[in-house]
């Protein structure tokens, strides 16, 4: 009927008719409602409101759901409609119907998700969407019950549906029964109970045979004592929750009085799906635009604590937590909801979201909300059993400190906004997000089933009683919240995946949820809805953070001067061969203090100390403190601009250096001049609260920030460690940390203050592990204190060269400690040596927490922070400064007696980072961490190390831990790479194999008579001409050449022509070399161009000399010839321009030999690629980064006269070992002494002598690198060594497989590289910024290079066509991943159907997930095809 827009009465009558129909209330009662009555209090919920909106839209209304939900009362709606267009009768639209109802039809989007989720390859898959219900009753008639089950199955087509290949089909009669009977009445009670528990566990988690039409199964177990246990197993592919209620109701009627069952409705589910799509096409298009616009801003799943990666759970099982609100509690909540204008479902949903936010790292997340959407024109739609569910995404952005009334209204507004756009369902939104490279997930479900009636219909209760228990499970769902009316109350149920969450976490969260709801029953909702920390957790943290300080307040330097007075002759410092006693050091310090006082230094002033490591540096620090000032340590290599920034920011009044410059700003005083001056009688008295030092750390803005620490703060930390370690005069501490790194504070004032001696490495030994090892052994060092990377360097030395058995305690801090490090350290140290891992911040007095490590438990992902030190406290807080529960990640705040005063002369930054609240003063570390449930603190990396890549939150520390867990990986560093689309990359350091046993015997050196003399003749000839030419030579270069000429002057040398004959050279070669050198020296080309010159490049020169030619020939002979059909993969390290390869090219191009050249310079590599045959592969090592796909790939690795190019030979050997497969061999030609001719060119590049090893040392280095060496041949100047690799067990496939077990796909690095060692910054920490820049450059080069893919094989091309059909895009690369090209699970299902149709091979989803690349799937498909052909052939023969 038409509704005139000017007739408010007619509009009201029509609205009340619709409401009466939707609410199931008498029309007279609805018409009696006032215009301002809140309809939510009358039973109107979101679903019914959505149905009303659709009815309005069918009559031409443009009102959306949100408008109707904003003021749900008749008067407001009439006002809105009065302003809207004329309403009319629904337009007559030809709705589609299914012609042949016996044919398969498509699944709905929700059914697709459930169907795909059953696959074993899905995360938390291998399980059906399933409900199991249990009832306990008596005197059931099995025959009548079986007949009732079959009756209901025949009434409803979807109870006879089979599901296959992503489609569904109605069967006339499924082959499997829908009833199961077990009679256990004769069993003992305990035996029957055991059997029941086993049966219940099986049936509650079973996957029904839906492919054969078994979608539900009704069971009866007859127990001893007359009890009957009735159970129902239902696959929710065929029925939603409302359908479950209908199924129960009809089972009750069919059992008690089947004649009362009405004729079933004629509506077919296929018709419904087709009609709904047609009716909602316009709304779906609008909703799609809405969600795509919101996509970049959508949050992700709740970041709840997990016990394991979801994909690691192969066979999910669920368990239920349940609580029933009483009738009184339920009524009070309903009354309060009506008073605040919200639905009861919104109340429960908001409370659920608040609990999730409390236990989530982020208070912004997505919820998955099912809508049971049965709207259709057929009035009997409510009598149809099928799955009418629509899933929608609900954005939750929970705010702290707001009242519950405000929170629930905000929640409801968001819910209504989502419902308004439900025509584009959640699954489509998530698929679109994945296609756009912004994957999201919504594995937490909020389902509300609060109908007017109870969950179990009266008809069923009359026959069998009420629900005893229930359990549900859904693929890909972590936690499923459900609400039901049961009896007079409301049942709250959480179904969660067993083993996914830490033990006890769901129970703790559920307890908080129930407690919140019970408090809401008795409150006005106007107070903040914050959830308190569980009481037991509060008590435990109070105990941990309440340890009293160990320190007696005093200055840092007091104890040392007291000890110097008590025992002046005791050793204080051991440096090189010097021994500085306490008395001598104290006197030097007081002399420096006297000089500073004379220069005008007064208490509180800042004095810079910028000296090389050594006794003078230590004396200067004590001297500054003795003068009453605070010291500002600056490295001697500090860049001038940064030095000026720090000096100005700190207000440095003068600097102690190795030069005198009184006019400089600040003035510089020579430490030697200060030491010659008079000494103070005693240190200037100072209060412990005075500033002791200012250490500058890097600032995020690029401006260094100076942490100002008082004496009292630092001494509190130091005393805690001294108390732990019991340091005394017998101890010797190796001081490897730089003065501007705060670990040195403990070395100086903890070590010397307790009476220990400091062993000081010299400035040039700052990164020399061999020098440290020598010092440890010589001085019997007992204490080690450093960043982990420095200890790793020390442990990399072979035990035969580094004896650490004097160490009794090792302190590590400042960076991640590898989990295997304690096990590698233990056998190298004294028995009983303890490893103490510390953490904290410079802003909190060196350290604030301690974890002593003996053994590493298997559940540790990293070495935890442990417990707070005495006098210090830790909090883990959220973004609002609230303490978060155990296991929840938050920001670490440090409090207590060791806090710094703040940032020097920067009150604004100090106020931001040092905060005050009701619990005291706290330093906000910017670190992420959490408390375990035993009170242990776990450090999880910097806040700025948690990154987002393609919308996915990623913790770099977790990626690194997963890499380090791989066999053969020593350490790793992950980073987000720039350069266009952000991606994740990582560098790993391979672990060297254990020391290898090889042969140290040396063959007799092959003589080359007259070679040295002949080479000297040519060298003198060239040098003489160059030195006489009018060329501007560098003084160092001229001196080096003249020195050589002088050294060789006394030698008796042959004539030039004889020298050329001995070398096998032509005179033209000599001329070419001289001309090339002359051009370089004249500036016609850059010195680096000599590496491209065939007569000057050092490797090329070595290969032209007789002994080099012989070594190269023997190396090539050592390469085996591949058998027919086999391949020999050969890698050449540090190829340079490959000029030396020319002499062996024919041998290297033999059939079956695959040659790959590796080079760190792209210029040289490009030159090699241009010159050499196309079949030779070239690979750049940008910044030394080796792409991980080359790990463990090669049968032979060649290094020709290149090992000396590495800073340490072990780095080159580690790289070679990483390239080799197990039992592969390194063929190494190395120079044993300099060649004069090679010196001509090399001196232009580097005026330092070449780092050449003696042959026994080289063999020892090979053995230490895990390579078993054998010298094959040698001359006096060059040697050929073969080394066998046991293999690291490390290759690209193994790495990928290991990462797949530990990390979800979004967290796996796109690219992996290998380095012999990670670069360190000045403080001995991994230089992450440098690595990220290197990886970004390397990635950019990789992306810029044209694809080297070979053409697709015929079977790959055929498969690619199948891919293109479903992906709607070209597929050209064999290593392309289906998912990276935009594929998803639904498209994969269609692809597998297409493969079956084209190739006749049935592949499972698990096969596809194992082989997601074109090449991998093609190989698998080819193997399956061959197997089928062989089977068919065998059958034909038989």
UniProtKB/Swiss-Prot annotation:
Protein name according to UniProt: Pyochelin synthetase PchE
GO process terms (BP): amino acid activation for nonribosomal peptide biosynthetic process; antibiotic biosynthetic process; secondary metabolite biosynthetic process
InterPro entries noted in UniProt: AA_adenyl_dom (IPR010071), ACP-like_sf (IPR036736), AMP-bd_C_sf (IPR045851), AMP-binding_CS (IPR020845), AMP-dep_synth/lig_dom (IPR000873), ANL_N_sf (IPR042099), CAT-like_dom_sf (IPR023213), Condensatn (IPR001242)
Known function: Involved in the biosynthesis of the siderophore pyochelin. Accepts salicylate activated by PchD at the first peptidyl carrier domain (ArCP), and activates and fixes one molecule of cysteine at the second peptidyl carrier domain (PCP1) via a thioester linkage to the phosphopanthetheine moiety. Then catalyzes the condensation reaction between the salicylate bound to the first site and the cysteine bound to the second site, and the cyclization of the cysteine to form the salicyl-thiazolinyl-S-PCP1 intermediate at the second site.
PTM-bearing positions, type O-(pantetheine 4'-phosphoryl)serine: 46, 1385
This enzyme's EC code(s): 6.2.1.69
One GO cellular component term: cytoplasm
Family in the record: Belongs to the NRP synthetase family.
Upper lineage: Bacteria, Pseudomonadati, Pseudomonadota, Gammaproteobacteria, Pseudomonadales
Transport found in the keyword field: no
């Amino acid at each position: 009927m038409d509704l005139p827009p000017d007739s408010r009465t007619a509009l009201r009558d029509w609205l009340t008719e619709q409401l009466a129909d939707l609410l199931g209330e008498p029309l007279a009662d609805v018409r009696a409602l006032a215009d301002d009555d809140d309809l939510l209090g009358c039973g109107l919920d979101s679903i019914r409101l959505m149905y009303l909106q659709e009815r309005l839209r069918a009559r031409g209304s443009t009102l959306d759901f949100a408008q109707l939900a904003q003021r749900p009362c008749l008067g407001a709606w009439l006002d809105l409609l009065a302003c809207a267009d004329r309403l009319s009768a629904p337009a007559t639209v030809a709705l589609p119907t299914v012609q042949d109802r016996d044919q398969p039809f498509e699944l709905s989007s929700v059914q697709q998700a459930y169907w795909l989720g059953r696959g074993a390859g899905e995360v938390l898959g291998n399980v059906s969407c399933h409900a199991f219900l249990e009832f306990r009753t008596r005197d059931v008639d099995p025959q009548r019950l079986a007949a009732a089950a079959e009756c209901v199955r025949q009434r409803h087509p979807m109870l006879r549906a089979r599901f296959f290949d992503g489609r569904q089909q109605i069967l006339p009669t499924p082959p499997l029964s829908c009833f199961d009977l077990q009679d256990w009445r004769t069993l003992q009670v305990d035996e029957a109970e055991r059997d029941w528990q086993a049966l219940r566990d099986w049936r509650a988690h079973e996957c029904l045979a839906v492919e054969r039409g078994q979608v539900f199964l009704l069971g009866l177990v007859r127990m001893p004592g007359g009890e009957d246990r009735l159970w129902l197993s239902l696959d929710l592919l065929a029925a939603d929750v409302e359908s479950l209620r209908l199924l129960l109701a009809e089972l009750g009627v069919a059992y008690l009085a089947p004649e009362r069952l009405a004729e079933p409705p004629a509506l077919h589910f296929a018709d419904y799906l087709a009609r709904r799509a047609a009716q909602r096409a316009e709304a779906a298009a609008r909703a799609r635009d809405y969600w795509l616009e919101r996509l970049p801003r959508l949050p992700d799943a709740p970041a709840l604590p997990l016990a394991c990666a979801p994909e690691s759970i192969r066979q999910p099982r669920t368990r239920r937590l349940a609580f029933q609100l009483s009738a009184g509690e339920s009524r009070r909540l309903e009354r309060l909801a009506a008073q605040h204008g919200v639905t009861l479902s919104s109340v429960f949903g908001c409370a659920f979201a608040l609990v999730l936010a409390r236990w989530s790292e982020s208070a912004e997340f997505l919820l998955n909300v099912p809508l049971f959407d049965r709207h259709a024109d057929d009035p009997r739609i409510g009598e149809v059993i099928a799955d009418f569910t629509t899933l929608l995404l609900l954005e939750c952005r929970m705010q702290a400190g707001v009242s519950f009334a405000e929170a629930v209204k905000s929640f409801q507004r968001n819910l209504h906004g989502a419902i308004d756009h439900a025509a584009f369902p959640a699954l489509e939104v998530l698929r679109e997000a994945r296609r756009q490279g912004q994957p999201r997930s919504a594995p937490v479900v909020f389902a509300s089933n609060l109908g007017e009636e109870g969950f179990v219909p009266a008809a069923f209760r009359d026959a069998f009683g009420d629900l005893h228990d229930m359990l549900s499970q859904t693929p890909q769902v972590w936690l499923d919240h459900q609400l039901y009316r049961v009896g007079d109350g409301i049942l709250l149920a959480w179904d969660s995946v067993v083993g996914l969450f830490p033990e006890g976490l769901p129970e703790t969260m559920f307890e908080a949820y129930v407690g919140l709801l019970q408090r809401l029953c008795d409150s006005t909702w106007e107070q903040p809805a914050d959830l308190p920390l569980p009481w037991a957790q509060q008590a435990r943290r109070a105990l941990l953070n309440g340890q009293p300080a160990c320190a007696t307040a005093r200055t840092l330097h007091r104890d040392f001067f007291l000890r110097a007075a008590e025992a002046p002759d005791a050793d204080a410092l051991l440096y090189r061969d010097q021994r500085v006693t306490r008395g001598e050091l104290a006197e030097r310090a007081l002399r420096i203090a006297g000089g500073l006082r004379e220069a005008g230094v007064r208490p509180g002033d800042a004095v810079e100390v910028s000296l090389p490591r050594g006794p003078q540096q230590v004396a200067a620090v004590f001297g500054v403190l003795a003068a009453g000032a605070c010291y500002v340590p600056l490295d001697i290599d500090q860049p001038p601009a940064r030095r000026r920034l720090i000096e100005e920011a700190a207000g440095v009044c003068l600097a102690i250096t190795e030069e005198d410059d009184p006019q400089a700003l600040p003035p510089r005083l020579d430490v030697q001049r200060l030491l010659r001056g008079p000494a103070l009688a005693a240190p200037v008295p100072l209060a412990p609260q005075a500033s002791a030092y200012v250490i500058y750390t890097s600032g995020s803005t690029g401006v260094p920030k100076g942490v100002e620490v008082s004496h009292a703060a630092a001494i509190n930390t130091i005393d805690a460690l001294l108390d732990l370690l019991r340091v005394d005069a017998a101890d010797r501490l190796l001081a490897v940390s730089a003065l501007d790194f705060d670990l040195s504070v403990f070395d100086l004032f903890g070590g010397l203050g307790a009476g220990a001696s400091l062993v000081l490495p010299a400035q040039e030994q700052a990164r020399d592990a061999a020098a440290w090892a020598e010092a440890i052994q010589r001085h019997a060092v007992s204490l080690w204190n450093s960043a982990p990377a420095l200890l790793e360097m020390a442990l990399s030395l072979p035990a035969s060269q580094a004896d650490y058995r004097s160490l009794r305690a090792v302190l590590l801090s400042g960076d991640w400690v590898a989990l295997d490090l304690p096990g590698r350290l233990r056998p190298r140290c004294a028995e009983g040596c303890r490893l103490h891992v510390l953490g904290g911040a410079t802003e909190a007095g060196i350290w604030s927490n301690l974890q002593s490590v003996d053994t590493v438990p298997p559940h540790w992902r990293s070495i935890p922070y442990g417990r707070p030190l005495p006098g210090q406290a830790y909090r883990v807080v959220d973004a609002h400064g609230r303490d978060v529960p155990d296991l929840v990640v938050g920001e670490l705040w440090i409090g207590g007696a060791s806090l710094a005063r703040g940032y020097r002369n920067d009150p604004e930054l100090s106020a931001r980072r040092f905060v005050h609240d009701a619990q005291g003063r706290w330093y906000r570390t910017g670190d992420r961490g959490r408390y375990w449930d035993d009170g242990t603190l776990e450090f999880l990396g910097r806040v700025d190390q948690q990154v987002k890549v393609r919308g996915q939150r990623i913790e770099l520390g977790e990626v690194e831990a997963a890499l380090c867990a791989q066999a053969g990986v020593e350490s790793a560093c992950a980073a987000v790479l720039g350069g266009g689309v952000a991606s994740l990359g990582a560098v790993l350091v391979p672990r060297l194999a254990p020391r290898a046993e090889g042969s140290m015997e040396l063959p007799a050196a092959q003589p080359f008579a007259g070679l040295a003399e002949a080479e000297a003749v040519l060298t003198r000839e060239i040098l003489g001409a160059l030195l006489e030419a009018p060329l501007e030579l560098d003084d160092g270069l001229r001196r080096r050449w003249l020195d050589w000429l002088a050294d060789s002057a006394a030698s008796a040398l042959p004539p030039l022509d004889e020298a050329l004959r001995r070398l096998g050279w032509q005179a033209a070669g000599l001329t070419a070399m001289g001309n090339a050198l002359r051009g370089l020296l004249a500036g016609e080309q850059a010195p680096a161009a000599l590496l491209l010159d065939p007569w000057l490049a050092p490797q090329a020169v070595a290969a032209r000399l007789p002994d080099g030619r012989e070594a190269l020939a023997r190396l090539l002979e050592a390469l085996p010839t591949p058998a027919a059909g086999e391949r020999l993969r050969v890698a050449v390290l540090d190829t340079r321009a490959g000029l030396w390869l020319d002499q062996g090219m024919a041998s290297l191009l033999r059939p079956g030999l695959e040659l790959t050249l590796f080079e760190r310079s792209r210029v040289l590599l490009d030159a090699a690629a241009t010159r050499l045959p196309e079949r030779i592969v070239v690979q750049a090592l940008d910044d030394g980064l080796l792409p991980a796909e080359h790990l463990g790939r090669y049968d032979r690795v060649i290094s020709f006269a290149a090992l000396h190019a590495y800073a340490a030979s072990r780095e080159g050997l580690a790289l070679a070992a990483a390239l080799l497969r197990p039992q592969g061999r390194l063929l190494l030609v190395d120079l044993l002494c300099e060649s004069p001719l090679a010196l001509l060119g090399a001196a232009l590049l580097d005026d330092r002598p070449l780092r050449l090893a003696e042959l026994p040392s080289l063999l020892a280095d090979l053995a230490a690198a895990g390579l078993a060496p054998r010298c094959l041949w040698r001359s006096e100047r060059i040697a050929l060594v073969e080394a066998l690799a046991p293999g690291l067990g490390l290759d690209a496939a193994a790495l990928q497989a290991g990462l797949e077990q530990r990390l979800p796909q979004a967290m796996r690095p796109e690219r992996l590289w290998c380095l012999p060692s990670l670069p360190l910054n000045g403080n001995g920490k991994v230089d992450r910024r440098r690595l990220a820049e290197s990886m970004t450059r390397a990635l950019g080069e990789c992306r810029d290079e044209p694809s080297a893919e070979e053409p697709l094989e015929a079977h790959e091309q055929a498969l690619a066509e199948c891919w293109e059909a479903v992906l709607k895009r070209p597929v050209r690369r064999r290593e392309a991943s289906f998912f990276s090209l935009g594929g998803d699970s639904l498209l994969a299902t269609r692809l597998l159907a297409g493969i079956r149709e084209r190739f006749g091979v049935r592949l499972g989803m698990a096969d596809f997930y194992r082989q997601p690349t074109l090449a991998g799937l093609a190989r698998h498909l080819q193997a399956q095809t061959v197997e089928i052909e062989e089977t068919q052939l065998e059958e034909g023969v038989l």
